[in-house]
């Protein structure tokens, strides 16, 4: 199964319930709603359609609200677009009531004049038009700039000043209104645009507290040099990270973006916080059914870097091939995951005093050593599953939680499949439930080993303190085991010695009520014994010890519960007989 999660942006190309359902089936785990576009009514309609698609597919997804953020844009241009040529000189006004002309344009942020300096650059429309500041006209509060390249400039286009600390607010009034709207409609994640300092995140967290929605996770979007410089402090107050490479690639030199991506992913991996690699990952698929080879490499390398999720923007929101974009990204993710041992960044070993995280590390190690394919984490808050995910185990992670909000919050974490169940009353109930749900989820089958982690008291956050290796199988009978071997073979049910001696063949497992010396011809050919009567001093037990033969004695009603010729597994260490071939240890 795919372990890397996919964040898919919804838009005009993905409004239909059937299309959204196809996106889910293709591999989308979280849907992003970009509040830079559209109104609340439009977004609510799409949210409702997502829930319809969930019912249609029987699968759960997360919902992410992406804020517009405090950004600088140009005002409306006279005639719609202005044309500039290299060497053209014009002015930038701070008066947002001015309509742009080839001689003077205006921006929406009056503080830009004070923030920038002569010799610095002002970029427009994602850097498509580059200008250098020649002069600051204090009298008119205008910047005199010279175009560094030919280009067209439209209305309401983005403005960037690379390397400059911009004194815009962390969140705008629109952002606050949008977030409150999202919280009223049960969003799971907030992608906070243009975060530059920790306070920007804390301002959003105040809104969560106001609505008693502290479970909603905040993912700051690092899009500037200032945000990069303050990252270590920003991530401390955040739940994860989105590496928004679009504006970042305008604010810092493009050649630095891959290095920043690797650094930020590594830092998030180290503290176990999920990270999303975003922007232009399969950009050409807005118009083409296949990605460029460079785009395929970009997605794969993000997986190799250790990202938890890869994201689609315009590809799924506005493109001609939204479903194909998701399915293509899913195939690339899986291919890269399979090659991770050879090409991926090794997971560093982290030192910690946190009990849950230590168990997460131990669970990953034990699963690898025993070849376990599924880890089941019983978790109230989701923290246990996140700490296991941090170590990127080869095994799938099935998170059993007791709250729908926790389930949705885990949709972004690498390798985690979350489900909701009724809260069990005891650890034994957790163990039984873990086996049942692992099979129902298709992550394990009879005969597989699973590794279960949970805590006591059951249902309390932060109590993860145990792990158990458990065999999934139909236990037929149990008694006292002699030896420590596991044997798989066909059962031979014998009523007496003559019956046993005539029916037992080399390697079969003798199942009988009792044994004595007359059973020896059969015992010498058998690979194991299951006997209803007797204890550790019985004939069967003594023979088993002397011959090194796995034996289970005191297996009540074994001759009735086990069928003649049935394939069974003898776990003499635990004294258990399982139906079928099981990987008991």
For the regions a language model picked out, list residue spans one by one.
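Structural preference for beta-strand elements that scaffold enzyme active sites
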Residues: 5-7, 30-32, 60-64, 89, ...
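Expand to "…catalyze enediolate/carbanion chemistry for C-C bond making/breaking, isomerization
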Residues: 1-12, 16-17, 24, 39-42, ...
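Acidic, glycine-rich flexible loop/linker segments
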Residues: 70-172, 437, 443-498, 503, ...
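ATP-dependent carboxylate/acyl-activation modules
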Residues: 88-89, 265, 269, 276, ...
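Conserved, mostly hydrophobic/aromatic
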Residues: 9, 34, 66, 119, ...
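Glycine-rich phosphate-binding active-site loops on the catalytic face of alpha/beta enzymes
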Residues: 10-12, 29-40, 189-194, 241-252, ...
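Conserved alpha/beta-domain cores
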Residues: 3, 8-12, 42, 164-279, ...
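Glycine-enriched alpha-helix->loop->beta-strand junction motifs that scaffold or abut catalytic
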Residues: 25-30, 184-188, 208-212, 236-241, ...
């Amino acid at each position: 199964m795919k372990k890397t999660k996919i964040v898919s942006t919804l838009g005009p190309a993905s409004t239909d319930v059937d299309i959204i359902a196809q996106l889910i089936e293709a591999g989308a785990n979280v849907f992003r709603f970009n509040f830079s576009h559209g109104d609340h009514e439009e977004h609510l309609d799409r949210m409702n359609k997502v829930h319809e698609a969930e019912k249609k597919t029987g699968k759960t997804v997360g919902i992410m609200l992406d804020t517009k953020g405090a950004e600088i844009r140009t005002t409306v241009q006279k005639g719609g677009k202005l044309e500039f040529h290299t060497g053209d000189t014009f002015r930038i006004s701070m008066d947002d009531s001015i309509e742009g002309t080839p001689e003077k344009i205006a921006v929406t942020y009056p503080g830009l004049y004070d923030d920038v300096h002569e010799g610095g650059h002002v970029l427009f429309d994602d850097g498509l038009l580059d200008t250098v500041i020649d002069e600051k006209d204090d009298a008119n509060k205008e910047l005199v700039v010279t175009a560094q390249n030919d280009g067209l400039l439209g209305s309401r286009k983005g403005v960037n000043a690379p390397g400059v600390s911009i004194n815009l607010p962390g969140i705008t009034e629109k952002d606050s209104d949008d977030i409150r709207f999202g919280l009223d409609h049960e969003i799971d994640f907030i992608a906070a645009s243009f975060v530059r300092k920790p306070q920007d995140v804390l301002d959003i967290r105040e809104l969560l507290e106001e609505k008693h929605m502290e479970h909603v996770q905040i993912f700051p979007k690092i899009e500037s040099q200032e945000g990069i410089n303050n990252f270590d402090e920003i991530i401390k107050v955040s739940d994860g990270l989105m590496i928004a490479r679009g504006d970042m690639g305008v604010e810092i030199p493009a050649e630095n973006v891959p290095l920043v991506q690797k650094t930020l992913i590594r830092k998030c991996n180290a503290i176990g916080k999920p990270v999303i690699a975003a922007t232009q990952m399969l950009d050409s698929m807005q118009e083409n059914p296949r990605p460029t080879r460079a785009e395929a490499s970009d997605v794969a390398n993000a997986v190799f870097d250790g990202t938890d999720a890869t994201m689609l923007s315009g590809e799924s929101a506005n493109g001609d091939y939204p479903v194909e974009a998701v399915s293509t990204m899913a195939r690339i993710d899986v291919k890269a995951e399979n090659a991770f041992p050879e090409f991926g960044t090794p997971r560093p070993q982290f030192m910690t005093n946190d009990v849950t995280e230590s168990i997460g590390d131990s669970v990953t190690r034990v699963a690898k050593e025993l070849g376990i394919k599924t880890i089941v984490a019983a978790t109230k808050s989701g923290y246990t599953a996140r700490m296991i995910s941090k170590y990127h185990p080869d095994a799938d992670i099935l998170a059993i939680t007791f709250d729908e909000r926790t389930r949705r919050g885990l949709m972004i974490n690498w390798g985690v499949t979350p489900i909701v169940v009724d809260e069990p009353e005891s650890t034994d109930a957790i163990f039984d439930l873990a086996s049942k749900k692992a099979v129902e989820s298709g992550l394990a089958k009879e005969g597989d080993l699973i590794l279960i982690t949970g805590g006591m008291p059951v249902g309390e956050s932060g109590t993860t303190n145990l792990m158990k290796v458990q065999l999934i199988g139909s236990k037929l009978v149990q008694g006292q085991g002699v030896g420590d071997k596991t044997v798989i073979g066909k059962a031979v049910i014998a009523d007496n010695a003559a019956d046993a001696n005539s029916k037992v063949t080399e390697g079969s497992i003798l199942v009988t009520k009792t044994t004595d010396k007359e059973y020896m011809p059969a015992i010498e050919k058998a690979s194991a014994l299951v006997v209803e009567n007797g204890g550790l001093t019985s004939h069967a037990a003594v023979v088993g010890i002397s011959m090194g033969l796995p034996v289970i004695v005191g297996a009540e009603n074994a001759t009735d519960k086990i069928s003649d010729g049935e394939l069974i597994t003898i776990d003499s260490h635990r004294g258990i007989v399982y139906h079928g071939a099981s990987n008991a240890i």
